[in-house]
Amino acid sequence: MSNSLSKRLFAGMAAASLGLAVTACGGDDKTASNVEYDDTVTVGILHSLTGTMAISESTLVDTEKMAIDEINAAGGVEVDGKKYKIEYIVEDGASDWPTFAEKSKKLIDQDSVPVVFGGWTSASRKAMLPVYESKDAFLYYPIQYEAQECSNNIFYTGATPNQQSEPATKFMYEKSPAAGKPFFLVGSDYVFPRTSNTITKSQVEQLGGTVVGEDYLPLGNTEVAPIIAKIKKALPDGGVIINTLNGDQNVAFFKQIQDAGITPANGYYVMNYSIAEEEISTIGSEFLEGHYGAWNY
């Protein structure tokens, strides 16, 4: 497939996705039946179906497959007067950054896909970026990220800090009843949590608050007890916890902070950047009641 056609199909899929979103908002569920296609185009879907990030990424696979089915039912993607049916190949990134790069190469070189929908963590994206740039293929990246990066081969669809963490930090500063407005930052140990928290530290200082502690866990490590002990020591009278833990680390974290009395009833409020419906159903809503999350629409 020519690079020019790949780019136009890439744009066509984006337009088709937007059209479906607008249709859904309008409540019109009519789709074309018995569609006749002139050709097919295959795309890749590359997320973690196993490992620590599967709790978040497996739902993305289901959502992307559903969107492709809806686009096909609505007539597919039209480029230069030809209708293309979208087919997909699913690969497992296995919560391992080198695997994301290897699977990207496989999808592009062996399966000849022009576009891949993939990744979650910034670590996975940064592992994949050289692959897409060197092969002039395209990656749809679906989640918030730390910004400070721009590539002609990546379509960044998630929020940047000025759209997520900065307004969330201001909200939590204003909400916190604790004297001195103390914050504790906890995250998974990779680029997004560390970069996001660097921005947060500067913002908290400008607002007049204090970052009293900061700690990180290697992604996949669920030994959260030492961090919880540090939070209790640094915030004896309550305060704000900015949480950038990812994957199944959040299951252990929220169950154990409740056991430790780190709850809204005791003046502790957690702001989360990577918890949505999928994680809530696994963690249990009773462990998250009274805490907060910030996402772009």
Residue ranges and their predicted role:
Residues 1-42, 73:
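Short, low-complexity disordered leader/linker segments with a strong preference
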Residues 102, 153-260:
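Extracellular/periplasmic Venus flytrap/periplasmic-binding protein
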Residues 40-61, 119, 182-187:
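Short beta-strand segments enriched in small/hydrophobic residues
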Residues 45, 107-120, 140-142, 182-187, ...:
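Periplasmic-binding protein-like
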Residues 49-52, 93-97, 121-125, 144-149, ...:
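Solvent-exposed loop/turn segments at secondary-structure junctions
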Residues 28-34, 55-62, 77-149, 157, ...:
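Beta-alpha junction/loop-to-helix N-cap segments that form part of ligand/metal-binding clefts
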Residues 257-297:
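Extracellular/periplasmic periplasmic-binding protein-like sensory domains
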Residues 41, 62-87, 178, 205-209:
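Signal peptide-proximal N-terminal region
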